[in-house]
Amino acid sequence: MEMLTEASIQYVNKQVESGIDCFQLFETYCGIIPEKMYTEIVLPYSKKILNAAMDKNCKTIFFPKNYNMGLKNINQDICDITSIDWQIPIESARTLLNDNVGIQGNMDPRIFFSDKKEIERYLVNLTSFGEKNTDWIFNLGHGFIPGIDVNNVN
């Protein structure tokens, strides 16, 4: 883990030198190990990588996919914004996260398999969260799924 972390920090440093304004770390497989194990063993390395960007005054976004209840372990010492997947209600994620950490995502990418009316209802419901939470960045809770109707995205 040390070697991967050091290589990642070198990557972060080069990205910052190249002029990025924000660095996002994806922990796509975060949820496949128990929360306690991830928090104790892996999160310190993620924090180190994110802190490398923060130390250079670069904003940070952390995406710990499926971390769910573990979101309570994320604070402003780890990242500026936490990106969340769609498998936890956004209100629950906001409650678990430290108030000083912004929130991004939560849109279920499977919604694009629905018809336009269903998509519209879903978006009205989701964006109402943003009306009450100005630190929320609208985004998918993960990437687009192959096979979606691109017209539904428009």
Question: Where do the protein language model's features map onto the residues?
Answer:
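Active-site loop segments of alpha/beta catalytic cores
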Residues: 1-154
